[in-house]
Each structure stands twice: as structure tokens, then as C-alpha cells.
């Protein structure tokens, strides 16, 4: 026991990661069959002990760094496309979509075992509604994600200030020809697809039944981001991540970037909530199981 306490003191995980993207978080019950499978217990709303755990702060740092890298690569890609005078000389919308999807794939893979690999306040919100993490951790994650996004966009502006300010800074706005309602709807549906994919790819019951599911989880999540970007870049530039939208808007800081900004918070949070309800209530029927 003394050795175990020493590990905790030195920074080893005292509190188990509840984020479902983390492979260790949902490993319990791997030997159970479908009939005997037991749902993981819901995370407490508030867990004061987390604030004394190094793993809590380590997870927040991982979210900060991941979101920083995400904004850095993706906004640089957007600037590269904007700089080109010919569609044939650039990667185009497909390349932008690949940069977003590819970075999510890589970063979820890298951070899944540390923080759960959220990299998105909408994902964190959806998982919180499903009681996969505490309110304390959810708020901390969202703050760190937003700070990372601001820093990532800021570094891009520092590298290419003229190009950055002259080409919209990667900020999300509703494109001409579309209404705010169109933009809101695109963000709701796009985020629903992403968060539903997160729930499905990291489902605890599937993880218990099929050992390969946790390892492959980053792939469908990244691919969902790629496909949503292909569909909605012409409408809103594709938000589906409030931290990504906030970071670009703060660093770009022009009126038209702020006039539509509410869409990129309200839409993703509604989409995440709908995905959480759909998966937990309809697909998994967890509220009904708890009564039986």
C-alpha cells in the first residue's frame, strides 16, 4: 500500500479517467457477455478530490496542447488555400476538410488515454450530459480548450499577420446567400453527427465485447469531422467546435466575425445535447435499464 500511495503522490492517476474515448476508462467488464454486462457508474456531478489529483491537471494540459495544435495546423491550412490564386494550385476544400479530420484523428489517438481526447467543448458537454465526467472536469476542459484555441490562432497570426487579417483569419461566419437559421441548422446537424460518432465509437458495451473498438475509435471520429467539413464549409466554414470558433474570432477580432458567433456556440451545444439524448435514451435505453 505504501508503494501505491507513493505513486499517487508522485503524480500517477488516483482517479480513473471516465472519458469514454480513453481506452482504460471503459475497460471494466471486458469479460462479461451482453446479458451480464453492467453499465459503468455515472460520474458524480462534483468531485472535490479531483482538484487534488495531478491527473486532473495533466488532462487539462493535454486538452490545451491538443487544441492549440489543432488550431495551428487547421488555420494555417485555411490561410494557404486563401493565399492561392488558382484552385488548381491549392488543396481546396477537400484539403481543408482533411486537415481538420486528420488532426482530430491524430490528436484523439494521442490524448485519449490522458484526458479522453475531447478537443471540443461540444464533445465535453455531450459527455457531461451522459454523466461520463464531472461538472468540475467539464468546466476545466472547456476553459483549457478555449485557451489552447486562442493561442493556436494567435501563433498563426504571428507568422502571417497580413495574410491572416486579409483572409478572414479562419473565423466562422455564415456565408452570403444563407440565413442565420441555415447556419444554425448546419451546426446542429454537423455537431450531432460528430458527437453521435463519439458515443458510438467509444461505447462501453462495444468495448467490452470487441477489444479492437477502443483502438480504432479515433478513426471514425476523425472521419466524421472530415465529412462534416466537406458538407458545411460552404455554409458556415464549419464550426462544430466552439473553442475553434472562439479562438479564431478573438484573434481576428472583426465585427462580422462576432455578429454570427453565437451560432457557433448554440448550434454545437444543441447538437451535442441531442446526440447524447439519442444515444443514451434511444440507442442504449440506459434510463430504462436503471429502473429494472
Swiss-Prot record:
List where in the cell it is found.
Cell membrane
Q: Which CDD domains match?
A: MIP
Motif range for NPA 2?
241-243
GO terms of biological process kind: response to water deprivation
**Disordered: annotated segments:** 1-42
Annotated transmembrane regions = 61-81, 96-118, 139-159, 181-201, 215-235, 263-283
Function comment:
Aquaporins facilitate the transport of water and small neutral solutes across cell membranes.
Swiss-Prot/TrEMBL domain comment? Aquaporins contain two tandem repeats each containing three membrane-spanning domains and a pore-forming loop with the signature motif Asn-Pro-Ala (NPA).
What is this protein's record name? Answer: Aquaporin PIP1-3/PIP1-4
Q: Which organism is it from?
A: Zea mays (Maize)
Give the lineage: Eukaryota, Viridiplantae, Streptophyta, Embryophyta, Tracheophyta
Amino acid at each position: 500500500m505504501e508503494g501505491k500511495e507513493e505513486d499517487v503522490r508522485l503524480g500517477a492517476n488516483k482517479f480513473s479517467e471516465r472519458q469514454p474515448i480513453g481506452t482504460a476508462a471503459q475497460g471494466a467488464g471486458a469479460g462479461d457477455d451482453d446479458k451480464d454486462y453492467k453499465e459503468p457508474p455515472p460520474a458524480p456531478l462534483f468531485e472535490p478530490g479531483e482538484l487534488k489529483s495531478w491527473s486532473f491537471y495533466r488532462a487539462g494540459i493535454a486538452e490545451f496542447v491538443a487544441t492549440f495544435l489543432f488550431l495551428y495546423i487547421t488555420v494555417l491550412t485555411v490561410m494557404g488555400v486563401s493565399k492561392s490564386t488558382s484552385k488548381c494550385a491549392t488543396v481546396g476544400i477537400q484539403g481543408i476538410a482533411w486537415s481538420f479530420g486528420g488532426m482530430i484523428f491524430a490528436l484523439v489517438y494521442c490524448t485519449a488515454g490522458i484526458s479522453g481526447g475531447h478537443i471540443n467543448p461540444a464533445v465535453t458537454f455531450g459527455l457531461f450530459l451522459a454523466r461520463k465526467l464531472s461538472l468540475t472536469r467539464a468546466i476545466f476542459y472547456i476553459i483549457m480548450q478555449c485557451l489552447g484555441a486562442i493561442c493556436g490562432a494567435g501563433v498563426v497570426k504571428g507568422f502571417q499577420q497580413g495574410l491572416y487579417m486579409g483572409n478572414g483569419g479562419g473565423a466562422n461566419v455564415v456565408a452570403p446567400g444563407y440565413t442565420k437559421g441555415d447556419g444554425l441548422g448546419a451546426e446542429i446537424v454537423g455537431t450531432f453527427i460528430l458527437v453521435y460518432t463519439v458515443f458510438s465509437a467509444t461505447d462501453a458495451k462495444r468495448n467490452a465485447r470487441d477489444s479492437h473498438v477502443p483502438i480504432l475509435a479515433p478513426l471514425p471520429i476523425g472521419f466524421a469531422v472530415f465529412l462534416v467539413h466537406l458538407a458545411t464549409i460552404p455554409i458556415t466554414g464549419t464550426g462544430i467546435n466552439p473553442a475553434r470558433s472562439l479562438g479564431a474570432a478573438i484573434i481576428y477580432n472583426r465585427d462580422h466575425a462576432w455578429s454570427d458567433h453565437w451560432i457557433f456556440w448554440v448550434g454545437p451545444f444543441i447538437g451535442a445535447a441531442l446526440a447524447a439524448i439519442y444515444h443514451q435514451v434511444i440507442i442504449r435505453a440506459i434510463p430504462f435499464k436503471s429502473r429494472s
